[in-house]
Amino acid sequence: ERYGDARPPEIFVSDTIRAAKRGERHAHFNKLLLDKMEAALGRGEQVMLFQNRRGFAPYVECSECGWTARCPHCNVTLTYHKGGRKLVCHYCGHTEDVPAKCPSCKVTDVVPMGFGTEKVEEEIFKIFPEARVARLDRDSVTSEKAFSAIIADFEARRTDILVGTQMITKGFDFAGVSLVGILNADNLLNNPDFRAAERAFQLMMQVAGRAGRRDGGGEVVIQTSE
């Protein structure tokens, strides 16, 4: 439910493959999103960026043989966390160091693949060095106090850009947010659950609802390769 008579945000779908072919993609951001971010920040407004994967990269892979690090207990790929250079299972909490070389073929080139909120935050710092950036996910929120501090800073406009996972969708009403970017809609749909499309739509609508909460005119950019 939106505040008063506020209009719903305008939604733009941006093709990541087409943007890359046109040279209109920087890091994990299409030019459309970056242009709208620059405009919003220039007006003194706030931006929220949604990427529903924690860590720096969802997995690491050997560029030679394709080996990936997997949890010995859950058999899921381990997420790479750049801080501490650790591989972490987000299901059971198993942690291990990044191997110096591929355990399978012994080649040293084991590289992070994909991107999570940690990488998004790092890239945003480089693209908008003057902006005040914060991250809201289970790694940055180590306590209720830490959670409250991040929310309070954003609400008081001491933060310009908030990067987060599903935690940023929880019904917050930030008056200063005029733009929401959904960085990778594909990973919401690429789920074996037969209700994946329905749940992806619900989640994207929740995220989109953070834009222009009070005075209308908000915008949402959904990046997808589909």
Residue ranges and their predicted role:
Residues 1-226:
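Inter-lobe coupling/hinge segments of SF2-like helicase ATPases
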